[in-house]
Each structure stands twice: as C-alpha cells, then as structure tokens.
C-alpha cells in the first residue's frame, strides 16, 4: 500500500508539472446550477473546456441582456439564476473576480471525477473482502463449542483488517488532499491566464458569431466591422494580450530553471510551489503596470470615443478595444509623420531669400565700361571722355560684388543641404519609432531604456521591464540599464 501511495503521489506531481501545457484544453464538469445556466445559453453535454464555459456565460449574459446598454462592462444579475449563483447583484467585466470565485466553487476537473470513481470502486472491493461469506458463518457455527479458539481467530483476523483499513484511509486522505490541491492549482492557473487585464467585453460579444470548436481548442473570431474584414484566430500567438506563453517569457532573456518533477520529497514540492507563486507575482505586477486602470494620469476627459461602436478608449490605444476600428484622425495633427507615411520622397524646403529683389545670375557676367548719358544740352554737345582710372576702379568693385554674391549663394546651398540632411535623419527616426518591438516584434516601441545621459527606444515597455529585471544590457549599445520608462506618442 505504501508503494501504491508513493506511485499515486509521483503521478500527481507529474500531472502538476504538465499543467502548463495542458491547462488550456482542461476538461471541467460544472455543477447542477451552473449547468442549467450553460444549457440555457445553448450548451450541450456535461463536460466542457474553460473556453466553452466562458463562451456560454457570455452568451447567457447577451441573451438575457443583463449588461448595461451605456456602460456595457457592467452586468446586473440581481433576481436571476446567475445572481443567485454569484451571490451578488452586479459585477464588472473589468474586475471578474466574483465570476472566477463562482467558477472555482462550481467546476470540477474531469481528472478528479475519474479519480473519485476509481476510489469508490476500490473502497467497494475492500468492503466486499471484509464481509464474511456463508461458508465462514457455517464453519463458525460448527466450532461454537470452543469459544476461546473462535475469539482468538477473530482477533487475529480483525487485526490485519483494521491495520489495512487504517493504511487505506490514510493513503486515501493523502491522495484526496493532494488531488484537491492539484485541482485548485489547475483552476487557479486557468483563471490566471484569463485574468491578465480583465476579461474584455468584445471577446464575449464576438464569440456569439462563427463559434466552431476544433480539435486543437482554437476558435475563429470575426470582428463586428464590415464583411470584408480580417479574421482573428484565437491562439496564444495572436491573443498575446490575453495569454502570455512561457516561450515568450524565455525569448526576452529571462531564463528560469524548471523544477525536478521526479523528486517525490516534500522539500522539492515546496520549492516548486514557491517558484510557481513567484512567477504569478511577477505576472500580476506586469499586468498591473500595463493595465489602463493603474494609470492615474489618464482621466475620462482624455479618453476618445470610437466612431463604430461608441466605446470610450484610453488615449494611448490606437485601435478600439472592442471592435478594433482605427482611431479617427490618428496622427492627423503631426504633419511630418503623415508625410512619412504617405510618401517616401522628401520635398525640398523652399530657399530662404535674405536679399529679395536682387537678381543673382547663374553664370559669370561680362563686365564692360558704363555708358554715361548726357542730362543737358551742354553734355550732349561735349563728347564723353574715357577715364581709364575710373573704369578700373569700377571693375574692381564689380568683381568684389560678384565674389560676395557667389559666397552668399554657396552658404545658402550649404545651409539647405544641412537642413535636408537633418530632416532625412528625423524622418528615419520617426520610421524606426513606427516599427514594432525588436524583441517580440508584436507590440509598439513604447519602452525607453535609459542608461546615463542617453537612452534607446528599441523595445516595448513589457520587454524593457523584463530586461531590467533579468539584469540584461541594452540591446542597442550593450550598456547597463538604469531605468525603464513608458513613452506615449501623442
């Protein structure tokens, strides 16, 4: 029996180690009240996945119209089956903790149900083994003449049976306790994946269309824009804002050593538990720092309203959080950025004419002696005399003015070239800012890595925080990271 309990503990620990890869497709069995709600929303069967449970709950809220028409993240469930099950009158989708508490109480994993059935069968077999048969009763009746011998035999028979029962009960209690902890950890990890920044309302709303379960647990979600819009696939690669996989955490440079699952000792299990709790705390801290609710500077006046679905969004969001419509007049007030997005050719800046009204020729002029026109009759009669000294002085003055004009035109051309060069560099900087993060290649570059008097804007805020926590250097210049700040482009 000791070997049986040890093997059960090892198998339970192995299954706990595989939670990270199997928790997405975890099969759960809802209790009766929750099952009635799911069936009212169109669910069939008694075993579902976590995604299907969340989908049918959203369907139930949509069909019953329990949400507020103006602020659709508020759900009023008072006087309804859902309210009786939750034990509250209303809740917000942005803070779905009452919903998760209800699911923890009313969901049972299918693995634990199978284990309970196996334990019931084993206890029934032990009970049948302990019941005396008819032959034993007849044999005891024939030997009733010797009561001392019968009592001794009964004592010797009940002693190993009681010991076996005690061992069985202890092993069963250990197994049930371990399974309850395992089940709770599975559900906690499932809810930890969903509770990243609050359950988005558009996820529940858009699941009512084109919901087709597949073998790999993925579904297709169609946005509620026009018919010719793109299809978003519900996978861990596309929905990075809902699920952050372990591979993405390791890709940034944070390497965590995995715990040894084969070690059955209590010390190993406590270390594994500490590592899992530490990872949860880090993820909660990151989600709190990235969520819009923790930003105290953003007020309701700064939020922008979507023209498609009339939802108010954070000023730092480019797309609507519900329908993914592009924000109207996005970067319309920034002429340089609009120009860099529309065309790649940079138009020349008009030349600054300091000396307006002066005709500057393109080639060298031919200088000749000036023609003096007589103003009165006396000068008309008198022939003009040619003075070589005066003509030479005039030529020198003409040469000096020409050299000054050439120097000024050269300076103007040099200034124009330098301005064009700086403009080109600024355009390249704007184009680099528009590129995605150099590490995850998904999120925008909003994490400014500061080192000394310089900084680099090459990664997103999420990856920059992970680089700072892991003690890594700047990916651009390999300097030590001193501070990481989040940049909002307005």
Curated annotation (Swiss-Prot):
Entry annotated with the keyword Endoplasmic reticulum: no
Natural source organism: Rattus norvegicus (Rat)
Protein name (record): Protein Mdm4
Originating gene: Mdm4
InterPro entries per record: MDM4, p53_neg-reg_MDM_2/4, SWIB_MDM2_dom_sf, SWIB_MDM2_domain, Znf_RanBP2, Znf_RanBP2_sf, Znf_RING, Znf_RING/FYVE/PHD
Oligomer status and interactors: Interacts with MDM2, TP53, TP73 and USP2. Found in a trimeric complex with USP2, MDM2 and MDM4. Interacts (phosphorylated) with YWHAG; negatively regulates MDM4 activity toward TP53.
One GO location term (cellular component): nucleus
Sequence motif: Nuclear localization signal, positions: 442-445
Region (Disordered): 136-162, 263-294
GO terms assigned for molecular function: enzyme binding; ubiquitin-protein transferase activity; zinc ion binding
